[in-house]
Each structure stands twice: as structure tokens, then as C-alpha cells.
């Protein structure tokens, strides 16, 4: 059986202005003197180890560093879940599993290094997901110049940012196969990514691709929801090349394989695990564990921890839901992908929109016909219940509760016939 409930949406209009204001002001706050002073000591101590080897040093870092959303706070452990607009960086199969479409704006600040602005769109039509994401990044000195501040930075150029400035564009497509009621199917997705970076001495054009698999299930779930509570994922990331525009020198990126698992045993709690291993260079795997706490209908807390050899990363954030808008913000300390400047802050605003096609309307019809059968079954009108559930199966052959209900109703009908025959004989 399924349980259906309708929740009245609160009025969100007065709070939306505050959400947009917070989003608009964060780039200024994150690049201000106050935030820099708060992390200056820690950044200085971590910078002393910047010559050490870490995965990001020889890579197009914007392909490795999260830019916002749940991926920012869960990291590699988000590989299996991949259920918001940050799935582009975690698992390209995520778009086929979105319960609603999303338009998202993210601001990410890597203190003393760079700032990234991201616009993402993702939607699902029937079993096919698609989307696009564009992010622009610039050094801290460029942002200060834009706001009229001193662009000189440190004398040693510490504020110029290792990545310089540029952009990354991602196109995504995915599809779900063999979807049923409890087993939601296996999704396959791919990303095509292109980036441009202009540094102090060189410019790079980078082209890469991702491939991802994602499976979702409903397993031992003790709360009412049609959404799956268990996910597994497998991803091949960043298979591609980078070309220096000045010398036309071609370099291969360092692709990686990531696997993930996520499980929500109760409504209020979800945990996730992730493992990522590079393929062309001998490096320790990145191991990650993440947690989500659904405190109320409107507030969710997220946290994760990751390690790679002697390096580690810690992150935490909060997600606030106001009607069709989700606001998230948080902090991440990351020595794994950028040891020289490990402090990151981010904020995001997501607008949830209906998915395309007639899938939502079809799902509503399926539920209504199933509930009609339940009412007949409760009234012991078993033949009418069977007829209603047969209609449910014609609308959705994979709706398993209807098939199970038909089987139970037929058993009761046979039992009723035997009892009637026994009464006649006596």
C-alpha cells in the first residue's frame, strides 16, 4: 500500500526578498577584510605545505572543486544521492532521478584565492533527464578591482589565484531504465564539459566527459514517501585533455572513478559513503562519509568528512526550504584538492519547477485509481477492487501494490466461494 498526504505550502513571499538579498551580498562579504582576517592565520599555516603533492595541483581545478549545492557539503559521498542541481559534478545520471526540475544559482568563495559563480538548470521529462550548467571563476584581486578595492593584493601575488579566470560549461543528458514502484530503475547519464582558463602566463582550453550510473530502491522504509531511500552510484570523471593555447601543448587530465552509497533508514536521517580513485597517477583514494539531518519540513543540516592519505576535508551546511525556493549556505575546510587555500564558503538559491511531460499527471491518476481499489477492498467488494486495480496496472504496469492487492483480493474471493458452497451443502 501507499500513503498519500497533502501538505499546505506556507506563504513564502515575505522571506524571498531576504533570501535574494543574502545571495546578492555574499560575494562582497566573502571577499571582505573581515572574513580574510578571520582565516588569515590558518591559511598561512596551510600555505606552508602548498608545495606538497595533491590531486588538484596539475589539474584544471574547477573540474575538481565543488561550486555549491549539496555536493559542496557532502563531497564524494554525494556520488550515489546526486539529487539536486549540483549533480553535474557528482554523478551525471542524477538528472533522470530529480523529483522536480531545478534552476539554481551558486556562489562559491575560496578564501585568499578565487570566486566562482554558477548557474544551473536541470529537468526531467518522463524517464529522461537533461540540463546545463555554466560557471565563471575569477581571482580575488579581480573581484576587488570590480568593487573598487585595492587590487594589489600581497606582494608575493598570493591573492591572484592559481586558476586565474575563465569559465566551465557542462551539458548533461541521462535516462532511467526498468523503473518500477520499489525498484526505481537504473539511470545512465553523461556530461560533456568544456573549460577555458587564463592564468598569469598560460591559457588553457580543456575538454572532458563524465559517465555515470545510478540505481535507486525502496528498502526497509518505515516512513510514508514515494521517493526511494537507498541509492548506489558509479561514475567515471574527467576523461579528457587540456590544451595550452600558446604552445598547443596537449596534456591528458587525470580521470577518476567514484563509487557511492546512500541510505535513509528513517525520515529524519540519511547517511552516505563515497570512494574516489584516480586512474593514471598513483594517489591514495579519497574516502568520504556524509550525513543529512532533516530537522523539520523546512530545515535540513548537512555535514561530511573526507580523507586522502594525510590530507582531510570537513564541511557543514544548512538548507532552508521556503515554498518552491531552497536556500543553502555552508563552510568547507579542504586540504585534499587545494592545500594552499583550504577555506571555502558558499551559498546557493534553488527554484524548484515542475518536471516536463505528463508524468506527474499520470502518477496522480495511478494513485487515485489505486485508492479507489483500496476503498472497495475495505468494503469487502473484492471484485470491484480487482477491476479498479487492473485499471491501475494498465496506467502503470510497474505499480506493484496494485498487483499485490489483486492477488490478495482473489484469495479472499476464492475463500468466500468455498464458504458459500459449504453453507449450501449444509
UniProtKB/Swiss-Prot annotation:
Q: Which Pfam families match?
A: UPF0164
Cite the entry's keywords alphabetically: Signal
UniProt keyword Signal, yes or no: yes
Q: Where is the signal peptide?
A: 1-37
Per the record, the similarity remark reads: Belongs to the UPF0164 family.
Q: What name goes with this protein?
A: UPF0164 protein TP_0548
Protein's organism? Treponema pallidum (strain Nichols)
